[in-house]
Amino acid sequence: MSKFLIAIVEDDRHLLVALESLLESAGYEVLLYFSGEDFLVSDRLQDINCLISDIGLPGINGIELLRVVHASRPYLPVIIITAPREPALLQAAMDAGARKTFVKPLDSAALLNAIAAIQ
């Protein structure tokens, strides 16, 4: 059986590496991308089991990425993370189809629980 494959789209390299370490130590396979465009041109959308994306990305933002992803894979679980504590932004992510939203700094245990719940 193949591992649960998670794509992470995050422009903060330190957070990206920290998330990679956290998820790999929990047994997940991880793909890393620095922008929504990098992810979309990677041709891995059909392979992943979950997408974790920041909202504040250069170019296409996380909410726009979520909409593009759900246009071809409407049931793919997407977790959105963001720095600003703006309820309207988090609500927009949920309205666009995010399964869960998290505000930075991330609670590692809560993130792992959210991923476990969607497996």
Language model regions located:
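C-terminal output helix
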Residues: 88, 106-116
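Short amphipathic alpha-helix used as the core "switch/output" element in two-component signaling
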Residues: 63-75
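Alpha4 helix (beta4-alpha4-beta5 surface) of REC/receiver domains from two-component response regulators
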Residues: 64, 85-100
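Two-component/phosphorelay signaling modules centered on CheY-like receiver
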Residues: 12-31
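The short loop immediately C-terminal to the conserved phospho-acceptor aspartate in CheY-like receiver
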Residues: 55-56
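Acidic catalytic/metal-coordinating carboxylates
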Residues: 35, 61-64
